[in-house]
UniProtKB/Swiss-Prot annotation:
The keyword Transport applies. The keyword Cell inner membrane applies. This is ATP synthase gamma chain. It comes from Rickettsia peacockii (strain Rustic). Pfam families: ATP-synt. PANTHER family: ATP SYNTHASE GAMMA CHAIN (PTHR11693), ATP SYNTHASE SUBUNIT GAMMA, MITOCHONDRIAL (PTHR11693:SF22). The lineage of its organism: Bacteria, Pseudomonadati, Pseudomonadota, Alphaproteobacteria, Rickettsiales.
Length: 323
């Protein structure tokens, strides 16, 4: 009888856990849908900044001032700034593992070359995974708020811009998971600065933003010339001729600010969508596993009860025969 009690207790416990995982699955599905909507709403802004950047890069970089050229040139013998985006909470499968693994591999490679490293970590899980081994490299750590927060985006941007303007870093690379669907997240390493001239700066691949890596040349990419770019917004494809005039000493700096801002915003939204997709999938799998375990435990309970009843019947029959 004690065995039956243990089985009933375990079944009750698994059912309780199943309710929690099911609720978390539904919450993550709802959050993911909202974030996908935010991504869609931000497409126009990201596309506009992308087109302006393409137009700017049609000019000769050496026509710019020394202060402006630093956004397009690598500063030798300075630190590599790595921005790592992970989750604040767990229970999201391998979401953080792929990012942390890639960051560790890149840090090891940079160390072997004798290069300097700075880390900006966003998300508690990434900080916990990297602080023991690379605490001396960590420049800043930001906790990830429960909802998409522009203040976080601005703080990270200010850190990047300050480091670049003060010539503290040679380049800036961001690590995040790009959202493909609820079951698939693509680990992405994206160079933000210095901005590479000969790249396709199109960022949009509806319904989810697809940002071509600045600094990572894509097959078939061609130099941008004639100060022209292509706009593909809401199914419409047309050529836009930018009448770009270089005026104002802060023009390039302001555009770079917008560009870095859009890159971070894009990465944060993609990372959040990927996190909720990974968590939804993980909780769905946990719910299904709980259901399978409950079925096995119920079967075991029924067999145990049947064995007890059979034993009691045999004892009753044996007793009646003895009488």
């Amino acid at each position: 009888m004690s065995n039956l009690k243990q089985l009933r207790t375990r079944i009750k416990s698994v059912k309780s856990t199943q309710k929690i995982t099911k609720a978390m699955q539904l919450v993550s599905a709802s959050k993911m849908a909202k974030i996908k909507s935010q991504i869609a709403n931000s497409n126009f802004y990201i596309e506009a900044v992308s087109k302006m950047m393409s137009a700017i890069l049609s000019i000769d970089i050496y026509e710019l001032s020394i202060e402006e050229q630093k956004f397009f040139n690598t500063v030798p013998n300075k630190a590599n700034l790595l921005i790592v985006m992970t989750s604040q909470r767990g229970l999201c499968g391998t979401f953080n593992y792929s990012i942390i693994k890639q960051v560790k591999n890149d840090i090891k490679e940079l160390e072997n070359k004798g290069e300097q490293i700075k880390l900006i970590i966003i998300g508690k899980k990434g900080y916990e995974a990297l602080k023991r081994q690379y605490v001396n490299y960590i420049d800043s750590y930001f906790e990830l708020p429960k909802i998409h927060d522009e203040n976080l985006m601005l703080q990270v941007k200010q850190k990047i811009m300050s480091a670049v303007e003060n010539l503290e870093v040679s380049n800036c690379v961001i690590y995040f998971n790009k959202f493909k669907n609820a079951m698939t997240q693509i680990m992405t390493r994206q160079q933000i600065l210095p901005v590479a001239k000969y790249q396709d700066h199109s960022m949009i691949d509806n319904p989810i933003v697809n940002l071509v890596g600045f600094g990572y040349k894509e097959r078939g990419a061609k130099p941008i010339n004639n100060r022209r770019a292509t706009s593909d917004i809401v199914g419409e494809s047309k050529s836009i001729d930018y009448n770009y005039e270089y005026e104002g000493e802060n023009l390039i700096s302001n555009l770079i600010n917008l560009y870095v801002n859009s890159q971070i915003n894009y990465a944060l939204l993609q990372s959040r969508a990927s996190e909720e997709g990974a968590r939804m999938t993980a909780m769905e799998n946990a719910t299904n596993n709980a259901n399978d375990l409950i079925s096995k435990l119920v079967l075991k309970l029924n067999r145990s009860r049947q064995a007890i009843i059979t034993t009691e019947l045999i004892e009753i029959i044996a007793g009646s025969e003895a009488v």
